């Protein structure tokens, strides 16, 4: 099976942790570097969570770079502790990794990796797009160096989750999102339309908790916190699968059922629709005819049920740490 070099940009909360573990377990992904950005938590906390998860997974060799603390305009809003816990990973305490941060910013790391792997590097962005925008400013030819970028963010027809119309990753830095989505590269946008309709249930969490692997068990514990938040949205203990679904699409392990390539704009005004992704879906009634110049594939629906694939992949985790005891991986 062909493996592609990946750069992951994340704001490591609970679903980011799931996405990271999924990438590490996927034979299609060769993670060469990870950048942290403020979103669910601050960039510094997200970087620490990422380092600790990599240590637990036996992948401490993967470099982690600190990225932007604040969005391009304004300042960091403080994260989402009511969703992810104060520490971003559901109050689960992981042993602190010995590895430190890479001696470069996340934007510099992305540019370097793109130059080292021209035409083959895949980018998966599952947080606000500040680091990606800064990389574009640093290297304007970045879109020609990157094979494709997959972004978890936006809401096409679905309601928002930060405001009535805006999804959190986009709304936390609309200016960055506008810059990234207007760049001349192949984008796959994974919005709330598909991530909110693919749900992880309590029986899936119990499978992770029953695993002999350190990583699946830690993820199962984190999901307890996540499920309690989503119970207020779904009426039962479960959760949406935002970031791991984007990861699976990025590696090509799942197939979109509806994914038109359309023009997408981001509202950067100061009004009530700030952060909204305006997707041109007017071709809906003609099976989405081609839109000249459009480069953004918007995934609206998925073939099959994603949850069993996610759990199976995580349970089959083959890292050296998977069968070890999760020292410190307990709920605080």
Describe each model-derived feature in a short phrase.
Residues 4, 47-116, 293-305, 313-315, ...:
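Metal-dependent C-N hydrolase catalytic cores
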Residues 18-20, 45-46, 75-76, 162, ...:
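Short, glycine/acidic-enriched capping/hinge loops at junctions between secondary-structure elements
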Residues 55-60, 69, 115, 119, ...:
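Generic secondary-structure signature for well-ordered alpha-helical cores
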Residues 41-45, 72-73, 155-159, 264-282:
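Short, mixed-charge aromatic SLiMs
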Residues 77-85, 163-167, 205-206:
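Short, surface-exposed amphipathic charged segments that create phosphate/polyanion-binding patches used
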Residues 64, 180, 247:
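A residue-level signal for conserved active-site and pocket-lining positions in enzyme catalytic cores
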Residues 2-3, 22-23, 30, 171, ...:
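Conformational coupling and interaction surfaces
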Residues 2-10, 14-51, 92-197, 202:
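Active-site histidine-anchored catalytic micro-motif
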């Amino acid at each position: 099976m062909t493996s592609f070099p990946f750069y992951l940009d994340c704001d490591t909360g609970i679903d980011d942790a799931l996405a990271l573990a999924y990438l590490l377990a996927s034979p299609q992904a060769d993670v060469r570097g990870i950048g942290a950005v403020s979103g669910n938590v601050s960039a510094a906390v997200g970087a620490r969570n990422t380092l600790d998860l990599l240590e637990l997974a036996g992948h401490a060799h993967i470099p982690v770079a600190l990225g932007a603390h604040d969005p391009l305009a304004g300042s960091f809003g403080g994260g989402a502790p009511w969703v992810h816990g104060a520490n971003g990973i559901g109050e689960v305490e992981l042993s602190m990794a010995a590895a430190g941060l890479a001696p470069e910013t996340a934007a510099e790391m992305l540019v370097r990796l793109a130059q080292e792997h021209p035409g083959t590097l895949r980018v998966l962005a599952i947080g606000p797009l500040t680091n990606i925008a800064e990389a574009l400013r640093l290297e304007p030819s970045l879109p020609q160096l990157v094979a494709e970028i997959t972004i978890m963010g936006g809401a096409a027809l679905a309601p928002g989750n930060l405001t009535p119309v805006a999804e959190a990753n986009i709304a936390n830095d609309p200016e960055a999102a506008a810059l990234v989505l207007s760049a001349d590269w192949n984008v796959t946008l994974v919005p709330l339309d598909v991530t909110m309709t693919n749900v992880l249930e309590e029986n899936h969490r119990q499978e992770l908790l029953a695993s002999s692997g350190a990583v699946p068990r830690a993820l199962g514990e984190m999901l307890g916190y996540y499920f309690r938040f989503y119970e207020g949205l779904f009426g039962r203990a479960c959760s949406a699968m935002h970031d791991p679904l984007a990861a699976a699409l990025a590696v090509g392990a799942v197939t979109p059922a509806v994914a038109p390539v359309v023009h997408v704009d981001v509202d950067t005004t100061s009004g009530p629709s700030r952060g909204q992704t305006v997707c041109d879906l007017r071709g809906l009634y003609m099976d989405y005819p081609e839109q000249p110049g459009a480069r953004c594939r918007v995934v609206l629906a998925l073939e099959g049920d994603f949850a069993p694939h996610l759990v199976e992949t995580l349970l089959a985790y083959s890292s050296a740490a998977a069968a070890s005891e999760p020292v410190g991986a307990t709920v605080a």
